[in-house]
Curated annotation (Swiss-Prot):
The N-terminus is blocked. This is Phosphoenolpyruvate carboxylase. InterPro entries: PEP_COase (IPR021135), PEP_COase_bac/pln-type (IPR022805), PEP_COase_Lys_AS (IPR018129), PEPCASE_His_AS (IPR033129), Pyrv/PenolPyrv_kinase-like_dom (IPR015813). GO terms for biological process: carbon fixation; oxaloacetate metabolic process; tricarboxylic acid cycle. Its cofactor is Mg(2+). Forms oxaloacetate, a four-carbon dicarboxylic acid source for the tricarboxylic acid cycle. Thermostable. Retains almost full activity after 10 minutes at 65 degrees Celsius. Coiled coil: none annotated. It comes from Thermus sp. (strain 71).
Length: 857
């Protein structure tokens, strides 16, 4: 097999030349010469030419802002094209590896490898089928500022992908010209409606095509290993937070929540109608040729067209029912099963497999909702809403003044009755109650209600009280949706087992959990990292899962985990399959939830084949973890890592609390500018307060460090491991998947960081604060040396593709950083914030670095 990376480089070269021609056509020869000059200087700097950096810096300092904006746009478009070429490269490599696998030598982390592992573990085909059909991998799509591409750009990139297949150079050039001449910056901050439409984009497109391939791939793999084909439904389902996540986002109103559910249902309905229309066209089976079951005949009786073609009539009737909103997910699933059995009963199983099974797979993955919507609200807002409701109902005048225990007791007593509290005709004056009740009424109750910043059982019982008010709760019965505590900070993670113990002892919540078949618990990777630092956050999350699982086991109620991961290393990013392998043994039940957000959506789902491979890797690890497989950590590993974690957290917190660090952070990084420019709908600071780092949201905290190429949240504090013996560290790395995953995630962040670029931002920092940077640079070097000693190899020793990708991209990200430093200086100068040209160019630079690094926050 020829080196696929050579094909990637050839395609990158082609697209680069086409972009050069587009720049000439749209912006002229003089500007093209400038782009080339900057590109060559950047390349020379990378190759060790020290003078090139200063020449480039001086060149940028003299540029008019219009030229800077155009330069950033040019290099950002290069990344869009490189990302496209990389996606195509990964598709080619995936196909080659799949074609080359054999039963004796299956592809790592693939369906065939999974089927073999299940058989080697002693599962019969029936047991393997039952196990896989029980699995529920829920992928939850969330909107975040890291997905920086407009839908118009996505459209051009998708068409470009098709034109690359055709190989017509003139059409390729025309498409690249269109791409280059398209405005990529939003004129205003995106609305939540924009985020909903953009965030759901991949569900009815690439994932719609991918899901049947996932089910087909699993079934075919089991058939190869066991000799008989099973009947599987999709183990993958989807959820959405877009339009339901009200935590700190004042723009998510009840009207937006209603729009989100309605939009997703309309999109799904359109796709299902297309599928049914295709079945009407395709299933032209004549009743004169084959026997037809009674149910199929009767199902199509109301249709006058297609005499003698009962299957066409049957699916035409289903089309009409769905169009008229007279069909549920369950009803459509039953109807498809009737048709499938009818075909199989007359020896036409192949027809059912080819034409009906793909639709059944989609229905089991998406339902008619496409991605049921979750609600998320902060506990304080829910308690505030409950307090007004209790006051208006004459139950208690000042609920918020009660202790947590008193709140729980009062709510438990109140929830024994079914009476609503709001007097007839009374309109709530408080915004918290009005919004909470409005959202519950607007919501389709198909997802879950997540309570962020959960501290006490009363935080969740408030949801029951509010749900009762809109007719969703009856005493002693479970709610029709999960109520999910979210534990985020280190303190909350440590307190989580006790909170869960008290929840499961509470009669209201226990009856609910039993009725729902278990309790879902969400753990947050973002705030815990910002709170405790990288190493301690990872350790605390691991320990919390062990303890929460033990509480559920002791109470006889399953605990299912919802992992609130981001795309960056600091927020639990990295290869998601390996992360599942690193979870505590026995903590993974048959249901697992993960967030999917930011540019992870484009990275994983831009092409159906990439989507299939990503889901294949997740399912490979999830299916085995759900059987209780995993490495139980040795006692001395726990002790050693516990001590190192404490030291790491102490160092991290000492840095953040040191006088002058917050002013250094605001000067060194573009954090203020991220908040001021139209990147995302959610405010950067919680509650609008700006006192210190605690008021800052986790995503912009990570994004700011990524922009300056230091990626501090993804590695800082790891040098605390230096206190442990090297043989012990190497043993833990070799034998403990959790520890290996943690270190390899940090290695990714360290490899993407660049001190040479980070140092350019020092010109923005007052001299008295520059010592912070020198400390961080020294910590960076120490941490790299430590990890390479543990690995006994370079940082990316087992991630060669990523290593080559970084080398390919860096010379083109660097110029954007050079420009960004100068733009920040101009923006912060008197009058700079009013300069629209500087604002636009700066926003473009933020988006450009995000496009170049691919996991901005």
């Amino acid at each position: 097999m020829s080196d696929p990376f050579e094909a990637l480089k050839a395609e990158v070269d082609l697209l680069g030349r086409l972009l050069g021609e587009a720049i000439r056509k749209v912006s002229g020869e003089r500007f093209f010469a400038l782009v080339e000059e900057v590109r060559l200087l950047s390349k020379a700097r990378r190759q060790g030419d020290g003078a090139a950096a200063e020449v480039l810096s001086q060149r940028v300092e003299r540029m008019p802002v219009e030229e800077m904006e155009a330069l950033v746009r040019a290099f950002t478009h290069y990344f869009h094209l490189v990302n496209l070429a990389e996606e195509r490269h990964r598709v080619r490599v995936n196909r080659l590896r799949t074609e080359g696998e054999t039963l004796e030598n299956p592809r790592p982390e693939g369906f065939l490898a999974l089927a073999k592992a299940l058989k080697e573990r002693g599962l019969s085909l029936e047991e393997a089928e039952a196990h896989l059909n029980r699995l529920a991998l829920l992928l939850t799509f969330t909107a975040h500022p890291t997905e920086t591409r407009r839908r118009t750009l996505r459209h051009h990139l998708e068409r470009l992908q098709e034109e690359l297949e055709g190989g017509d150079r003139e059409r390729l050039l025309a498409r690249v010209v269109l791409l280059y001449a398209t405005e990529e910056v939003r004129k205003a901050r995106p609305s939540v409606e924009d985020e909903i439409k953009g965030g759901l984009y991949y569900l009815p497109t690439t994932l719609w095509r991918a899901i049947p391939k996932v089910v087909e791939g699993l079934e075919a793999a089991l058939e190869r290993v066991y000799g008989k084909r099973p009947h599987l439904r999709s183990p993958v389902r989807f959820r959405s937070w877009m339009g339901g996540d009200r935590d700190g986002n004042p723009y998510v109103t009840p009207e937006v929540t209603a729009f989100a559910g309605r939009y997703a249902r309309e999109v799904a309905k359109g796709r299902y109608l297309e599928e049914l229309e295709a079945l009407v066209r395709d299933l032209s089976l004549s009743e004169a040729r084959i026997p037809v079951p009674k149910e199929v005949r009767e199902g199509g009786e109301g249709v006058e067209r297609f005499p003698g073609e009962p299957y066409r009539r049957y699916f035409a009737a289903l089309y009409r029912a769905l169009e008229g909103e007279a069909l549920s997910t369950e009803g459509l699933a039953r109807a498809l099963k009737v048709a499938e059995k009818g075909l199989e009963g007359v020896g036409l199983a192949q027809v059912a497999q080819a034409f009906l099974r793909p639709l059944e797979a989609r229905l089991s993955a998406f339902g008619l909702e496409l991605a049921p919507l979750d609600l998320r609200e902060e506990s304080g807002k829910l308690l505030e809403a409950a307090a007004e409701l209790l006051r208006l109902g004459g139950v208690h005048p000042d609920f918020l003044a009660l202790s947590p225990e008193e709140k729980e007791a009062l709510l438990t007593e109140e929830l024994k009755t079914a009476r609503p509290l709001l007097p007839v005709g009374e309109v709530p004056q408080g915004e918290a109650l009005r919004v909470a009740l409005g959202a519950l009424r607007a919501w389709g109750d198909k997802g879950a209600h997540v309570v962020s910043m959960t501290h006490h059982p009363a935080d969740l019982l408030a949801v029951f009280l509010l749900a009762r008010e809109v007719g969703l709760y009856r005493p002693g019965k479970p709610l029709p949706f999960d109520v999910v505590p979210l534990f985020e900070t280190l303190e909350d993670l440590e307190r989580a087992p006790e909170v869960l113990r008290r929840l499961l002892a509470n009669p209201v919540f226990r009856a609910h959990a039993q009725g729902r078949g278990g309790v879902e618990v969400m753990i947050g990777y973002s705030d815990s990292n910002k709170d405790a630092g990288f190493l301690m956050a990872n350790l605390a999350l691991y320990q919390a899962q062990e303890a929460l699982h033990a509480v559920g086991e002791a109470q006889g109620i399953p605990v299912f985990f919802f992992h609130g991961r981001g795309t960056s290393t600091a927020r639990g990013g990295g290869p998601a399959g390996r992360a599942i392998a690193g979870l505590p043994p026995k903590s993974v039940g048959h249901r697992l939830r993960l967030t999917e957000q930011g540019e992870a959506l484009a990275d994983r789902y831009a092409h159906p084949d990439l989507a299939v491979r990503h889901l294949e890797q997740l399912l490979y690890h999830f299916a085995q973890a759900a059987l209780g497989d995993g490495v139980e950590p040795k006692a001395h590993w726990r002790e050693a890592l516990g001590e190192a974690g404490e030291r790491s957290m102490a160092r991290y917190r000492a840095l953040l609390s040191q006088e002058g660090f917050f002013p250094f952070f605001e000067a060194f990084t573009p954090i203020r500018e991220i908040g001021e420019l139209p990147i995302a709908s959610r405010p950067v600071y919680r509650h609008g307060r700006v006192r210190d780092i605690r008021d800052l949201r986790a995503i912009p905290w990570v994004m700011a460090w990524t922009q300056v190429r230091l990626l501090l949240p993804g590695w800082y504090g790891l040098s605390a491991l230096e206190g442990l013996p090297m043989p012990l560290l190497r043993e833990m790395y070799r034998e403990w998947p959790f520890f290996a995953t943690t270190l390899e995630s940090a290695a990714m962040a360290l490899a993407k960081a660049d001190l040479g670029i980070a140092e350019r931002y020092l010109k923005l920092v007052p001299e008295g604060l520059q010592g912070f940077y020198h400390h961080l640079a020294e910590e960076y070097r120490r941490t790299v040396a430590l990890l390479e000693a543990i690995f006994e190899a370079p940082l990316l020793h087992n991630q060669k593709t990523l290593e080559r990708q970084i080398a390919l991209r860096n010379p083109y990200v660097d110029p954007i950083n050079f420009v960004q430093v100068e733009l920040l200086a101009r923006y912060r100068a008197p009058g700079g914030r009013e300069d629209e040209g500087v604002r636009r160019a700066l926003l473009l630079s933020l988006l450009g670095v995000a496009a170049g690094l691919r996991n901005a926050g």
